[in-house]
Amino acid sequence: MDYDYDSSDLQYDDHKQNSNSKLDTSFRLFRTGTMSLFNNVVIVDFTYTPTSIYSCQYTIIDLNYKVLETQNILFSKSTNEPFNDKMDQINKMICDSIDKLSGRVLVLSPQSVNIPLLNLPMSVRIFDFQQIAKKKKIPLKSFDQFKDYYKNKKLNVDFKFTILSLFVDLTKNFIKSDFKFPSFKPILIDIKREGSLEGFFGHYIFTNIEIPIAIKNLINGYRDHLRENKLLLTQPELEIIDQQQEEHQQLQQQLQQQQQQLQQPQQKSEVQQKSIVENEENPPSEMESSISAPPPRRITPNELLDKKKRILFLKNLKKSLLLKKHQLNHISNPDAENDFSEIGETTPKKIKVLNLEKDNNNNNNNDKDNIYLEKDDSPTKENNSNIATTTNTNPNTNTNTNINTTTANNNEIANTDNNVNNVNQVTDQGDIKYHHQELIRQLTKLIRFEQKSLKTDSNNNNDNNDNIDDNNNNINKISPTPLSTSINDINNKNNTTNITSSIPPNSTNNNNNNNMNTIPLGTTNNDNIITIPLDTTNNNNNNNNNLNQINQNEFNHNILLQVQTILDKTILNQQYFLNEINNLSKRFDNMQIQFDSIYSKIKSNNNNNSIVNNGNNNNNGNNNNSIIDIQKKQKELLEKQNRILVLKNELQKLESQQEQVKLENDKDKIRDSKERYKFTGNKYPKKISNNNSSSSSSSSSSSNNIINNNNHQIDPYNTYQQKQKTSLQRRPPFNKPNTSNVFIKTKFRPINHSVSALPQKNTIMSSFRNFLKSFKK
């Protein structure tokens, strides 16, 4: 946009030119927006001749309209000091003056040529007016106006005045309150190699004219000097170039590896086709046929039944886990609604582990059959190129046999790290809900997988022949066990990581799964993590037996034991506080006795001194000191009393809470007993709830009104009398049922799987939570 300058905007007297203590009164820096982020502004400018640099000037301005420091440095031609050393001194002076300032500093430079000469740290924000003006496409008339204005002012006389006036003009015409000061990188500066010398010699602050070749050589020589001597305070340009080259090489290596991986399956398929053609042309002899691998073993009907049993067991286990999650949601949030979709605030990262029955020819794995394991490790570049494969094969098997393979691509191993043994640990130790959610999800995956394997086995039985050797027991078959995973040792020689799940194969020749992490039933890694046992057997029979031996009641009992341990800890804490209160009360009593004795002695001494020596100043001074000591002790005793009172109040609150919990438990027991034992018949009518009482009374009144309408005799007191009669008909007394067999006299009620047996809002855990909140306060 075009704009004109008024003479009233920039009028400087001789006094203002020389004094530089303040800026023009009409100029105001913005105290809002991005300018308010900075505490000081440094304006740096260089003046040039056709062949060299003439001078350097910089000023430091405070946002309170004050000039803190001004410097004008001339490059004298008489001295033999080289240009690079002179520039090093100037940069050192600017850095020293910036170090004295507090807060963030904004460095302004009116020309793009000045910025390569500055060697400032990365913490300083450098801003170039000329680049921003060109990006905003400001018309050239404005530059011409700047040139004419500063040319007429004869800026060579006073350099301080030029910088201040420049800053005022630029902030008035270009900078707004919401203007963003972009960070500047010296590498992005592109100084043109060819340029004209015309119009550059007027000491113009703003120029869009080409730079002379001599000045280009000076600037480039100074940058080379900084690089060679490693004097750059910013990140060196050579290091950035090296990093870019390394990244380019890494990308090329990754592309080559991917191409090799794509070529490998094609080569395998070609080799297989050649072998098939050779077998057709040259049939194998009797010896070769005996050595070759036999067809896969036929699966017996007992094994199919075992698989069906296993699927049923997994489904039942999933249901029980859903119930436990439902109960845990009640315990943690009794007031909230039960929503199975809520897992938690944090979701840990996961590793994809493949452990499926796949043919060797099928290289594409579906995500539905993948088992995800928890892992909270950041991806590293070292493991991106590694490919982990662990195979359990038999040399006597055919290509159609099911082989236990675990493969992972580059993207799947990107999340692995050296700390791979920590997979069994849940990231948030207290997040039991998420742990149960993960177990349920893994169970669903296993159930799907078992069902698929059942279908494939049944199909294979129909296709295979009956006359098959029984010597093929070494073929691997997957027998999954849920809820736990382990990772084998890392092969340091090949720089590859072997990732396997804890699903044991049937073959006894497999030695890779010997170091599995096993957790027995009822044990816990942490206080709040519930685990389920692993199956480490290598035979199918032992596998199925161990799976069937898991009892759901034991799992429930483990959860109750964990809750009981938490409550026991709270009781121990309560006893500890009681002991502390008793000790403090005893100490308080002893201190009070000492205080009384000291106070009585001092009082007697004061009386004696007043009778004997009324005018003795020394005794009065001693008495004053003793009174001050007494007052100090009184204050200490009062503070201790207040502490004891606070602790007693907390004790009373705890006792009241315990009584409320007991009463609520008793009420729950009585209510449950009444609801379970409702007697029917004329003698013992059913219990009528409060909601039904109003409806029954209304129905009775309506029936009475109908009778009265039929008889045409309306009695206003008739309905009231009938209500009174019904209220007088009380329930006959009956003996309470013997609840000794129903309720077990223990601290905790046995948990049923039905929804009615779930804990209510006012339970032990809710009171326990309130108890913990009182301690936090």
UniProtKB/Swiss-Prot annotation:
Biased segments, Basic and acidic residues type: 357-380, 661-678
Q: Which GO terms describe its cellular component?
A: nucleus
Q: Which residues form a coiled coil?
A: 237-271, 629-678
One record GO biological process: regulation of DNA-templated transcription
List, alphabetically, the InterPro entries matched.
Disconnected-like (IPR040436)
Q: Which domain of life is it from?
A: Eukaryota
Q: Where is the composition biased (Polar residues)?
A: 712-729
User: Has the keyword Coiled coil been applied to this entry?
Assistant: yes
Record keywords, A-Z: Coiled coil
Task: Output compositional bias ranges, type Low complexity.
Answer: 263-273, 383-400, 459-476, 484-516, 688-711
Q: Where is this region: Disordered?
A: 263-303, 357-400, 454-516, 656-741
Q: Which PANTHER family match?
A: DISCO-RELATED, ISOFORM A-RELATED, DISCONNECTED-RELATED
What's the protein name? Putative uncharacterized protein DDB_G0289041
Q: Can you name the source organism?
A: Dictyostelium discoideum (Social amoeba)
